[in-house]
Amino acid sequence: MIRINQIKLPIDHKEAALEKKIKKALHNTEYKQYKIVKRSIDARKKEELSYVYAVDVTLGKGQEEKFLKKNKNRNIMAVKEKKFEFPENQREFKYPPVVNGMGPAGLFAALMLARDGLHPIVLERGKDVTNRMKDVEHFWESGELNPESNVQFGEGGAGTFSDGKLNTLVKDKFGRNRFVLETFVEHGAPEEILYENKPHIGTDLLRNVVAGIREEIRSLGGDVRFEAKVTDFVIQDGKLTGLIINDKEEIKTEAAILAPGHSARDTFKVLSDRDLEMNPKAFAIGLRVEHPREMIDHSQYGKGADQYDLPAASYKLTYHANNGRSVYSFCMCPGGFVVNASSEPERLTVNGMSNHDRAAKNSNSAIIASVTPEDFDGNDALAGVRFQQKWEEKAFSEGKGRIPVQTLKDFREGKITESFGEITPNTKGLTSFGNLRNCLPEPVSEAISEGMEYFDTKIKGFNREDTILCGIEARTSSPLRIERDQGFESNIKGIYPCGEGAGFAGGITSAAMDGIKVAQALVTV
């Protein structure tokens, strides 16, 4: 197979134009078929927006070697398709392996074990995605929180109520990244995620994909249980022998993949009490900022935003503040919503969420600043958790149980907003005016304020006074890391930490890939 990179075409090109470019690159050598492997928008020249393609081309028998011998184009090369293959099980298990958690890491770990014929028991503290959706909608409308069924807990994990981004910086020579995307497509995700430079599913489509994976696990003999919270771990002589479910039932097992998500603070506490080795780690905290989608689109695409049918524009911004903190955009949601993502009573955190069409009036992103264990009160494993809880409590209090919102102008002046400008919030969850400076450490507030000013040099209008701020974004990643060895096992034999909650991933795809890796370790001698 031959790959042709850097095929550039106008945004409004027809399919025939791509085929013509392929023929030209091949000097009219006959080819059987082509497959788009990557497509991105080049918006560096706003007056000349273009798509840039990479395609894989299959030539006729004997033609590939002949063509490559004569080829002098550095954008054309031979490639071999990487097809990930999960190994056959090599171990004997007295009891079925258990997967704790049904976010991307747990789902893919369970899927791999099920496809290997191991009939895993899959435990999720929250509800299935359909009933979870009802609880979340009720919370957004009424403010009544179900601590076990919310934006953080339930089938699909926190990513179910997000933008559904699938890009990752994790490199994997074995093809796990592609495998994850292909699995999503098998279960109903749009095929474009296989080649778009910044693939995303959207929360509306992701829910059905997650349910489809669950049903495959069940069809292969997996035992999937909802509202099954792991409340304790039975450990004898440094080895796991069982799990306690809902403080009642004991499930015997010698192998449990632990994928609880980054908000399973009660689980972290139990594990700490059981002497599982874990350490606090750096993360980031901040606010969600909202701008008009049209403003962001015009900034990124120029006049092309009006001329062409383009996806809602995204951005990625970074800044190093004078106080030494890194400030950056995180989990940018084009055409999306700011959602109340709380999971604990009297504590409040937010996140961003988009549907597949990304058609909402505002585009939002977290603007966050780094915090390290030096910022925490104490140096034990749960110090970062307590840090999050402290500021989430302040946010809950400031908003009187609702999402506290403020204009950028008033944030800088430290006063409560009385009325909005042209921009109004686009949220899922009730809102209230509040002073967000009371909800963040002062060095973080200062770094964010400074960063917003700098970001205006990259995106005109980013620093406008009526920019909406919503707070706080406290769950950007896990506040701790559960240590594991080269075999992916913790210091307690039989417990295999996994995914974002354990500190080994950031986002849907990397968490899913980590779930596959850990499942692979489990079945390999």
Can you describe what each PLM-predicted range is?
Residues I2-Y51, V55-V525:
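Residues forming the flavin
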